[in-house]
Amino acid sequence: MIRCVGAAEERFTEDALRILRAIRFSAQLGFEIEEHTENAIKKIAPNLVHVSRERVQVELTKLLISPLPGRIRQVYETGISPWVSETFHRIPEISGGSCFHIPSSVPAEKSLRWAVFMRKCEPKEAVLVLKALKLDNDTIYRVKTLVQWIKVSLCGEPTEDSIQSDKDGAAIQAGYLKKELSKHNDRIKTGLRRAMSRMEPELFDDLLRVKLCLAEECPPAAECLRALCCLRDEIRRDGDCISLKMLAVTGNDLIKAGMKPGKEVGTRLQQVLELVLEDPVRNTKEYLLSLLSSVSDA
């Protein structure tokens, strides 16, 4: 049982951050908060407005990476959330309450747990929450990217939304993708390469890890995601080009071939990358320069 030493209201008045620590200890240790202590939390919650956002963020992050991250619900039930930030307070409304479903299988890493907590938010809303709490720019970028892509089907696999709305339908959808994987592997790999090209390798790995955790309640969907993980490994093992840096030609090559320096160089390289994502065999300097030359002549 979590309780204060002495009078709870006095302890929380001395340092309002203790109200968040009480909830964090509850999540870390699995203990319940004693009734009088909880009542004092509700009463002293407005004092949290006087605590620096950095200190508030540290407690919320520790809560989210705890063994019981879903206990962040208590931050809302005790009336603390309005005193964190307006956008933070609205997260349950935006998500329909699903923000409190944070599978313990999601790795206890700051960016992953924050992303899962805010996965129903728009990326810009997630950024507002994290900036208000003074999180570092790298974490904000990682969370924003994950929030943007968690709800997207990469290659036709069921998303968390489709699983929640129609689990049987999601299982059927997963079955179709499984057949596609066995018959049209190249088409699926093209889609996966495109998705991989949109973010850093580590972030893409985090995205698949999170998607897999959120698909656990639908085994066929989870099986599809494991198959996509295997395809990802195959793409990397084969050295398939998935970024501008991996292209066999560079901007300098295009300029030497006669193209004027400027935005057009970047545009052409992006067009070439799209062709190579479809078929990695095309990624040779000779082929790509001849292709660009024929386009210029036309």
Give the ranges of each region predicted by the language model.
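Charged substrate- and nucleic-acid-binding regions of tRNA-handling and nucleotidyl-transfer enzymes
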Residues: 1-5, 24, 207, 213-298
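A residue-level signal for conserved active-site and pocket-lining positions in enzyme catalytic cores
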Residues: 15, 20-23, 74-75, 147, ...
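Double-stranded RNA-binding/processing signature
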Residues: 46
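Amphipathic alpha-helical segments within well-ordered protein domains
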Residues: 23-24, 42, 61, 127-134, ...
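Acidic, glycine- and histidine-enriched catalytic cores of nucleic acid- and nucleotide-handling enzymes
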Residues: 1-37, 43
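Conserved, hydrophobic alpha-helical core segments of structured domains
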Residues: 49-220
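A generic alpha-helix surface/boundary motif
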Residues: 20, 54, 123-127, 247-253
